[in-house]
């Protein structure tokens, strides 16, 4: 009877391909990469405009 009750428990818990920490690490790395891809072009434009138009940023 114990073997019958243990087999559905094993069927309920699936075997993960990766550990939970690896999945969380991949998700966090994806968020960091997507954020940098989103913010880096805007930062480059701001730096370019500050260098090419020095009157606007307060330099005389």
Curated annotation (Swiss-Prot):
Membrane topology classification: Single-pass membrane protein
Subcellular location: Membrane
Pfam families in alphabetical order: Smim3 (PF17307)
Main localisation: membrane
Gene Ontology cellular-component annotations: membrane
Keywords, ordered alphabetically: Membrane, Transmembrane, Transmembrane helix
Transmembrane stretches, start-end: 20-40
InterPro entries: Smim3
Transmembrane helix as UniProt keyword: yes
Source species, domain of life: Eukaryota
Annotated site residue numbers, Cleavage: 19-20
Single GO MF descriptor: identical protein binding
Entry protein name: Small integral membrane protein 3
Lineage of producing organism: Eukaryota, Metazoa, Chordata, Craniata, Vertebrata
Gene responsible for this protein: Smim3
């Amino acid at each position: 009877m114990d073997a019958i009750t243990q087999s559905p428990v094993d069927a309920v818990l699936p075997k993960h391909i990766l550990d939970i920490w690896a999945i969380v690490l991949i998700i966090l790395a994806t968020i960091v990469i997507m954020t940098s891809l989103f913010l880096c072009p805007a930062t480059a434009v701001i730096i370019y405009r500050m260098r090419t138009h020095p009157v606007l940023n307060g330099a005389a």
